[in-house]
Amino acid sequence: MNAYSTDDFSALSEAPPLLAVRDLCKFFPIRSRGVIPKKTGDVKAVNRVSFDLRRNETLGLVGESGCGKSTTVRTILRALDFTSGHAYFDAAGDGRYVDFGELTARELIPLRRSAQMIFQDPFSSLNPRMTVGGIVAEPLVIHRMAKGAELERRVDEMLLKVGLKPEYKTRYPHAFSGGQRQRIGIARALVMNPRFVVADEAVSALDVSVQAQVINLLDDLKRDMGLSYIFVAHDLGVVRHIFDRVAVMYAGRIVEIAPTEELFGHPVHPYTRLLLASAPVPDPDRRRELPKAGEVADAGNLPPGCAFAPRCPEAGKGCAAEVPELLPVGPDHFAACTSAG
């Protein structure tokens, strides 16, 4: 297992990041029909994505359905194999980075202690044949981190942290509400004290009344346990208050990234402005004209140049000539747009 330092990749942050993603690509081949299928192209689900996740930060990854958010985080954690690129992770917190993309299946196993995932669906992500105690204890058992009384103590402690009673250990998932099931999933993800957690649409399947409770719980756990999150979301209004920074994705690329208040207050990329304008306003007396949405880009047949150009109200002749790079447009604010200044 090779070890890297910040000298091995260009820094996008002043302080050494916890995770540095560089030129990450995940392509899915398109094959023709027939007796002998031939590759005819690629679906570029994730296309040269680069960003840093800072220590004790919540980075929001937002965009429309199909833009590549979930594929990005699943590729980083090697639920999907890389097509190319790197994801440098400081697993031990000692400045020695490992690259998720080059690790073997055996080398990935100890990394799972430090990097975990909270899944979207609290109903299908829990084994209905296991008790709550068994579900939360399973990571500790697999990684041989605790047994006997110590195992029971850590499970009880984790259940209390997520707002569940230890006596629930003997019950099965079907006995709980959606919000309680998601708390069980959170307990399972955090019981090994990871440093980095992906929350993939972790509240989108819950009732609106429960979403705020789970979001606030995740924010409290971040402070208590020193966590760093990548939080995948499409409902900006629900999760805005826990994001430290926001990265906006479109057609497999990050088109803008900035601190939360900066991005919401001064969006630069036309797609970011469209996304923010499309968010519902909780005031029936406020009316506004919504921008024309247009057709979402096909990741298997992207147009030349900027993928958003066919939908962009500000598109010029140069937009179809080349793919814009993510460049600084302000302090800690980056955008991939030829008209950004």
Kindly give the residue locations of the regions a language model identified.
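A short, proline-enriched helix->beta-strand linker immediately N-terminal to the Walker B motif
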Residues: 191-195
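P-loop NTP-binding/switch modules centered on Walker-like glycine-rich loops
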Residues: 198-202, 206-287
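Conserved ABC ATPase "signature" region
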Residues: 92-96, 149-167, 276-277
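Short catalytic/signature loops enriched in Gly
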Residues: 2-17, 31-37, 42, 97, ...
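Helix-to-loop junction immediately C-terminal to a conserved catalytic motif
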Residues: 77
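ABC ATPase NBD Q-loop/coupling interface
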Residues: 86-110, 147
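Conserved ABC ATPase signature
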Residues: 172-176, 180
